[in-house]
């Protein structure tokens, strides 16, 4: 399993950032997430959805579900299918707005390519997570 944890400060209130973080907006902020569909609300206040993701030139289909939702604090989603992962979005109030943190734990879905390819994919995904954070910041501050 690979783990990536990155944060950014956003000049917007926690409530606004949390409310925006729904599956519908994911393709707007996540460049490799090609499609999100079949979004359904869950009794825990979260969602389930299907997705299409492109990594290292390969296309993956899967499903995600919020397994934990603490309003204005955190969401945890579990993804199955093409890429198995757990993604936690944390929202922490800070003086100038919100500290937004994404922690992604995932299984690199290309075992046959070995450690070199895995290192490349992990680095690529670290860069992608920085882009997601920057895009969320841009959407919230405009």
Regions found by a protein language model. Give the residues of each.
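Structural motif
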Residues: 14, 46, 73-74, 88, ...
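Beta-strand/loop substructures that line and gate deep hydrophobic ligand-binding cavities in soluble
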Residues: 78-131
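Hydrophobic beta-strand positions in extracellular immunoglobulin-like domains
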Residues: 10, 53, 104-106
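Hydrophobic ligand-binding cavity/cleft-lining segments
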Residues: 1-44
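Generic structural detector for well-ordered beta-strands
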Residues: 7-11, 65, 90-92
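Hydrophobic residues positioned within well-ordered beta-strands of beta-sheet architectures
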Residues: 4-6, 47-51, 62-64, 87, ...
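Glycine-rich portal/gate segments that line the openings of hydrophobic small-molecule binding cavities
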Residues: 28, 38-83, 131-142
């Amino acid at each position: 399993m690979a783990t990536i944890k990155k944060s950014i400060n956003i000049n917007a209130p926690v409530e606004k950032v949390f409310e925006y973080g729904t599956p519908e907006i994911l393709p707007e902020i996540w460049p490799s997430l090609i499609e999100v569909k079949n979004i359904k609300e869950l009794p825990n206040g979260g969602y389930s959805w299907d997705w299409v993701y492109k990594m290292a030139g390969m296309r993956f289909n899967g499903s995600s579900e919020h397994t934990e939702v603490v309003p204005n604090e955190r969401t945890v989603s579990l993804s199955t299918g093409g890429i198995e992962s757990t993604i936690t979005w944390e929202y922490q109030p800070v003086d100038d707005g919100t500290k937004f943190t994404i922690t992604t734990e995932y299984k690199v879905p290309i075992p046959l390519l070995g450690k070199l390819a895995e290192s490349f994919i992990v680095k690529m995904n670290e860069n992608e997570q920085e882009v997601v954070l920057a895009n969320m910041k841009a959407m919230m501050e405009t």
